[in-house]
């Protein structure tokens, strides 16, 4: 693949679009990018075949009035053979697992609550650890709590920090344990 050849690739779709380059496969044959419409209400995750220059749209997303850029999450698993993508297509932020061709494999989380930022992905166990908001009836919906979900099962979500407080968690590289510091306005930090 190391030909040092410069190849111009047409990645234009919308006038004044915004481009984020996301990932390159280990073999260098696939390049992934995300493009946004200037109005920020439409986006596409695309893959470029670096040998041919062909661009393929894998995921197309629209959200009115606009996409929430700050909560955006795209993770490439197993060298780009799977894509974990966060979407608000149902009105709630949730995670979706796609194959390398953009076919939906599983909606990992769902329901009337928000799946927030990912804290860790364990590809060996096929699990994600993420912040959730508003899922538990007895926990203030503004508090960050930690959940674990299985990538291959729909709604296999487990609450890991059940205290009614906002949690700040550090997860061990092995995913076997985590350190939790939680607090709220009327509760000093507990570790």
Give the ranges of each region predicted by the language model.
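Peripheral, non-catalytic segments that deliver or gate enzyme domains
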Residues: 1-191
